[in-house]
Each structure stands twice: as C-alpha cells, then as structure tokens.
Amino acid sequence: MKMIFKMAWRNIWRSKRRSIITISSIFFAVFFAVFARSFQIGVYNKMIANMVGMYTGYLQIHQNGFWEEQSIDNSFIPDQSVLDLLHDNKDITDFNERLESFALTASDNLTKGAIIMGVNLEKEDGLMDLSPKLISGEFPAHTSSSLLISEGLASYYNMSVGDSLILLGQGYHGASANGIFPVSGILKFPMPNLNDRLVLMPILAAQELYAAPERLTSLVLQIDKPEKLNKLKKYISKKLDLEKYELLDWKSLLPELVQTIQADSAGGVIIIGVLYMIISFGILGTLLMMTAERMREFGILISIGMRKSKLILTLIMESLFMGILASIIGISVVSPVRYYFNRNPIRLEDQAAESIEAFGFEPVIPASLDMDIAMNHAGIVLLIVLICTIYPIVTILRLKPVKAMRT
C-alpha cells in the first residue's frame, strides 16, 4: 500500500500540466460552490437575526403549555434555580423578563385590541433596539406606570405624549385588569403587526395591573453566538424541569420564517445542483483527457505484470490526492474572500434597498463564515471526483495491453 501511495503521488507531478489542469478544475468547483452557498446562508442568518432581534429572541422559557394556550393564567414565578442557571451560563449574555397579555384599549369613543407587554425597558432595548424607534417622548422609569405605545395605536387615537390611555382586560385567575395610564413615549416599529397594536409598560406596573405579582409569561434569552444555539438548548433542557417549564427556540416561535427559508433554500439547492452538474462535466472532461493521454502508459504497466486492481487503486489514489489538494487550496483561497464579504457585505441599492429598509433591516447581503459550508461542499466535490473516476476504472478493466501500447 505504501508503494501505491508513492506511485500515486509521483504520478501527479510526473505530468505537471495535466495535474495542474485537473487540480484547477476541482479548485474552481470548490471555490464557486462554497462562495455561492456562503452568501445564501449569510442572507438566511441575517434574516433570522433581524426577525429574532425584533421580538422573540433565540430561546424562550415558559410555563409548560403556555405557547399552546397563551393566557396570563399560564404565567409562572421562576424558581431561583432557573435564574441561577441563566446567570451562570456564559453563552447567555442576558435574559428578559416579560409579562404579556391582551387588553382592550380605549380613548374617547374609540376602542382597539392591543398586546400589553410588561418588560424591563433597559433590557428590552438591548434586544428590540427600542431607542432608535422612539419618535416622541421618553422611556418611563422602572417604577413608573407610564406607557410606550406604537405609532399605529397613537395615530388611531390621535394621541401624543402626555395623553392617557384606558386599558380594560382580565388579570390573573379572573381578576379585573383596568386602569388609566399616561403615555410617556411613542415607538415606530417597522413590522405592521407590532406597530398597530403594541403597548409597552414597566414590568412592575404590568404585574400590578394584572394582579400577578412576581409572575412572568416568558424569559427571553439573549445570546451573542447563534451557532451555539443547539448546544445551549440541549444543556438547558437537561437542567430544566421540563414537566414544569417549556423551552422553545426561534424555529418553534417563528414557524413561518422557517417555512420561508426552506422554500427559498429549495431554489438555492437547485442552483447549486446546476453548478454541480457543470462542475461534474468539467472534472469528467479533465479525467477523460488524462485517461486518453495515459493509455500507452497503462498498457505498458499491465504488460510488465502490474495487476489491474493495483493500477485502479493507484488511479483512485491519484484522484483523491488531487481532489484533497485542490479542496485545501480552494478553501484557503475562498476563506479570506468570505471574511471580506462578511465584514464588508454587498449593499443593495434603489428599490431593493428601500423595500428592506421599510422593515427596519439593513439592506446588505453578507457572506457566512460557517466552516461547515466549506467542509460539506469540499466533501461533495471529492465525491464527484470519485464518481467521475469510474470512467478511467472501466477503461482499465477493458484495456487490452497490446492495443493500448500501439496508441
């Protein structure tokens, strides 16, 4: 076997022109496959970060059954062990306590349903980026009973800072949840479903309104390394009492986004598939050329006693060596390109940019730095190389030494 390795390696460099052509074709295959997929995954990651940062976070903890029946009666008082678990984990940068419910808002002769969200506004600003969305007024103090209302709600009631809004709802276990609250600020959200009906208030005031002291409907976990999400979820699941609590990631919280990505990814897979077809024909073409050039060589080797099985194994080793070498070069060359476009993403312009900016998102297309993309596509290209090697293998099996030496 050692001799076959040596022969395969020396054969590669015996005909440098031929080897360089083969390695170049595989190199470009790896480069373009990784380059194209990196942008596609980069767009998905940016979309996820935008949507998750808009409202849900990457992970949420609720009382078991809350997500199926989102009622304030399914709120909970978090155990100290849960809070300690979240505080002690270095992958969790922070967590937001929320008390969410529904209420009827009213002013003068108008009424409208709204989402009432009691939060720690300082923490929520870190997740939802509230400061740039504040178009009028100021954030209420943590102990205040003032409200932040969305622009759509303010327009509906023709309200401004300093006016009062009536809230009518049902509190914990049927308690009355009514009150008149001053408006301290107005927020403009890019998402219509939030901009038309969201009311934020300090969590202490919300707990008092709904007669739910110390109770929460969700703990929203903030993480700065989304690639560690699955590992973090598994770790917390092992430590959490899953009979009492439920732990949901963004995929469970935003199933529509998952479906959108899956539908778009299917189109991307088709494009990558077409690219692989082109790649396959390119690699096959170089192997056809290599086989035709070496017919006499193969005939001589078989004539002097080399078994066809060893010759085939040598040829497979040659293809693997060239494939691995080309993949390493391809990954090495594409990595700084991916890094550049990750730090300096392609900026969209004109109408495309305006349509994205309308939702409050940055109109950019970044490249993903996920090494799994490079390794997976390098592996696929190597598999294509091995499949294309079937032709020279069949040629050797059918080879007649005398005829081949006359070629």
Task: Give the ranges of each region predicted by the language model.
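Transmembrane alpha-helical interface segments in multi-pass membrane proteins
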Residues: 288, 297-342
